[in-house]
């Protein structure tokens, strides 16, 4: 979804369409810069939704190919 970037009191601002608006109780956000990309998330909640979300299925990596144990010199 595209939107507009504009100047407000000599600072950049982004107009969020209703479809992607933040909840009304969000008063502060964090902006994470990844190259030219900007990720806007409610302040203090950056990883909460990720960890609270669905976890992997019970059979995740059941058939993982793992190399055998290596013999190493002790120090």
Swiss-Prot record:
Keyword Membrane: no
Keyword DNA-binding belongs to the record: yes
SUPFAM superfamilies: AbrB/MazE/MraZ-like
A GO molecular function held by the record: DNA binding
Domain SpoVT-AbrB: 3-45
Keyword annotations: DNA-binding, Plasmid
PROSITE patterns (UniProt xref): SPOVT_ABRB (PS51740)
Stated family: Belongs to the VapB family.
Protein's name according to its UniProt entry: Uncharacterized protein in traD-traI intergenic region
Species the sequence originates in: Escherichia coli (strain K12)
């Amino acid at each position: 979804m595209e939107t507009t970037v504009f100047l407000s009191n000599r600072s950049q601002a982004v107009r969020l369409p209703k479809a992607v608006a933040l909840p009304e109780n969000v008063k502060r956000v964090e902006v994470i810069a990844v190259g030219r990309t900007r990720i806007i998330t409610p302040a203090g909640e950056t990883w909460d939704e990720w960890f609270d979300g669905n976890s992997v299925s019970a059979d995740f990596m059941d058939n993982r190919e793992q190399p055998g144990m290596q013999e190493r010199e002790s120090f």
